[in-house]
C-alpha cells in the first residue's frame, strides 16, 4: 500500500527507538521518561468508578464537561494566579494533543515556529505535520539553558508566527526566571507572536517559583497554556491534558478534534474533576519525595570525575 508522500520521511524519534530496544531487555532502569513511579491515588480511581456507576458512559461534550473545565480554572487560579473561565479551556487526550491541535488551529502553510532547545522532540514533527516550519533556537549553559531575547532575535524572521516555550523544561529541568520571562513577553508582543506555553511540569518546581506566562501583562490574549494531570496527579495512563487560552482558539481546536477523537473519555474527566479539587496536599508530599531524590542523584553525579 502506497504511503502519503508527506509521511515518507517520518521516522521514530531517538526516544521511541530507545523504548523499543529496552522492551527486549531485562533489569533496565528507565530514567528517560517523565513518568512518576507513584500509582494513581485510590480515591481518584474510585471517582472514576463512581462515574461509571452513575451512568457517565456515553459520548462527552467535545470541549469537555463544563464542571471539569471549571475545576481546571480553579486549580490554575489557586496555584498560579491565572484567572480564566470554562469557555477558555479545552480538555484533551493528553498534553500532546493540545500542542498538535493548537498548531493546527494557528498555523498557515510556511509559518515558522521557534522551538527552544533542548526540547521535547515531537514538537518538531507536530509543527511540520500542520504545515509549519520548526526553527530550532539553541540555548547555552551560561544562561541556564533558558532562552534569552538575543537568542530569539537571531532566529526570528518575517515568517515567524509563534514560539513554543517549555518551563519547567523537559529535558533540561530549567525553570525560566520571572525577569527573563518578562523580557521574552516583551519580545513576543513586539513581533506579534503567539506562545504555546508547555507548563505540564508546573507542580514539580523544587526551588524558586513557577511563573505562568499568561499571567504577565499583555500575554493573556496571545498565550495558550498547556497542562495536564500526568505529572501532577500521577495519571499518565489516563491521558488527561488540557489547554487554557482564548475562546476562539479553544473553539477551533474543538472543531478539529471532532473529526479525530470526538471528545475525551468521560470516566477520566470525572476522575480529573475530583483530582483537581482534592489532591493539593498529596501534590506537596510527592514533590518533597521527588526533591529528595533529585538532591541524592545530583550529589552522586557531582562526586563523579568527568561529570559536572
Question: What residues fall within each predicted segment?
Answer:
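Conserved PLP-anchoring active-site segment centered on the Schiff-base-forming lysine
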Residues: 105-127
Amino acid at each position: 500500500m502506497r504511503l502519503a508522500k508527506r509521511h515518507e520521511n517520518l521516522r521514530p524519534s531517538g526516544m521511541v527507538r530507545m523504548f523499543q530496544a529496552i522492551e527486549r531487555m531485562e533489569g533496565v532502569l528507565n530514567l528517560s521518561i517523565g513518568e512518576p513511579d507513584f500509582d494513581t491515588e485510590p480515591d481518584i480511581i474510585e471517582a472514576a468508578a463512581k462515574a461509571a456507576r452513575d451512568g457517565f458512559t456515553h459520548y462527552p461534550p467535545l470541549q469537555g464537561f463544563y464542571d471539569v473545565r471549571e475545576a481546571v480554572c480553579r486549580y490554575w487560579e489557586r496555584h498560579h494566579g491565572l484567572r480564566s473561565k470554562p469557555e477558555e479551556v479545552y480538555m484533551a487526550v493528553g498534553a500532546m494533543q493540545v500542542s498538535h491541535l493548537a498548531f493546527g488551529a494557528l498555523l498557515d502553510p510556511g509559518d515558522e515556529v521557534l522551538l527552544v532547545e533542548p526540547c521535547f522532540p515531537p514538537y518538531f514533527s507536530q509543527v511540520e505535520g500542520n504545515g509549519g516550519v520548526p526553527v530550532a533556537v539553541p540555548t547555552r549553559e551560561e544562561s541556564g539553558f533558558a532562552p534569552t531575547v538575543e537568542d530569539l532575535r537571531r532566529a526570528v524572521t518575517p515568517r515567524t508566527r509563534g514560539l513554543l516555550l517549555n518551563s519547567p523544561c523537559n529535558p533540561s529541568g530549567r525553570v525560566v526566571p520571572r525577569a527573563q520571562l518578562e523580557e521574552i513577553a516583551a519580545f513576543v508582543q513586539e513581533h506579534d507572536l503567539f506562545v504555546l506555553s508547555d507548563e505540564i511540569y508546573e507542580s514539580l518546581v523544587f526551588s524558586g517559583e513557577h511563573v505562568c506566562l499568561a499571567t504577565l501583562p499583555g500575554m493573556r490574549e496571545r498565550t495558550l497554556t498547556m497542562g495536564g494531570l500526568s505529572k501532577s496527579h500521577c495519571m499518565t495512563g489516563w491521558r488527561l491534558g488540557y489547554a487554557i487560552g482564548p475562546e476562539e482558539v479553544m473553539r477551533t481546536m474543538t472543531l478539529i478534534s471532532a473529526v479525530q477523537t470526538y471528545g475525551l473519555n468521560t470516566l477520566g474527566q470525572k476522575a480529573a474533576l475530583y483530582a483537581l479539587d482534592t489532591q493539593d496536599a498529596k501534590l506537596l508530599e510527592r514533590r518533597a519525595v521527588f526533591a529528595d531524590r533529585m538532591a541524592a542523584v545530583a550529589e552522586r553525579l557531582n562526586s563523579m570525575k568527568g561529570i559536572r
